[in-house]
């Protein structure tokens, strides 16, 4: 006796398997994991390494592209909350795959008072599970990480809403620093 399985069921099973396997391709950074170190250049040609900031709270926000609507909303929200962020004694870095020159134009246009780091090959974004690739085209995903003074991930935000994100960062920095 031969069992015949309908084609649509086979296709569904194959797609479900591919979908399930896609979650195991790269392990996500979790709270309490050691934050991957990096050394990247900012819009003023200064290099920043995460290890230079041990002992401080660090906010790393990855974003897709300079001077685009969502990214501008996010950057300007952080700019407008700069005094509150400084009051938490945290340092904040924006990171995208754009060039140093692009970051300089973006920073000057919107008077951004924080460093924006250039990750042109996407290696740092990839180490933070924040790289989106489509063939040879790459962009950073809109993800954010709060790193504690010991260099460990204290909070992750995946696929953030640019308009509401700054307040979430501030609230969580205050909460995490009380623990």
Tell where the protein language model's regions lie, with residue ranges.
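Structural microenvironment flanking redox-active thiols in thiol-disulfide oxidoreductases
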Residues: 72-112, 123-125
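N-proximal helix/coil linker or "cap" segments that precede and/or mark the start of modular domains
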Residues: 6, 14-37
């Amino acid at each position: 006796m031969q069992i015949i399985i309908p084609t649509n069921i086979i296709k569904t099973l194959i797609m479900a398997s591919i979908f399930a396997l896609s979650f195991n391709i790269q392990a996500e950074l979790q709270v309490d994991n050691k934050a991957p170190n990096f050394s990247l250049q900012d819009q003023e040609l200064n290099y920043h390494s995460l290890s230079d900031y041990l002992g401080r709270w660090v906010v790393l926000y990855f974003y897709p592209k300079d001077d685009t609507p969502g990214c501008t909303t996010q950057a300007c929200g952080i700019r407008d909350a700069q005094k509150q962020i400084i009051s938490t004694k945290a340092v904040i870095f924006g990171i995208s795959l754009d060039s140093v020159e692009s970051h300089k134009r973006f920073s000057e246009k919107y008077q951004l008072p924080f460093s924006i780091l250039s990750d042109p090959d996407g290696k740092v974004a990839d180490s933070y599970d924040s790289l989106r690739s489509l063939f040879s085209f790459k962009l950073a995903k809109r993800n954010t990480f709060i790193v504690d003074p010991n260099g460990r991930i204290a909070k992750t935000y995946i696929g953030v809403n640019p308009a509401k994100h700054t307040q979430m960062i501030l609230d969580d920095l205050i909460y995490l620093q009380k623990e």
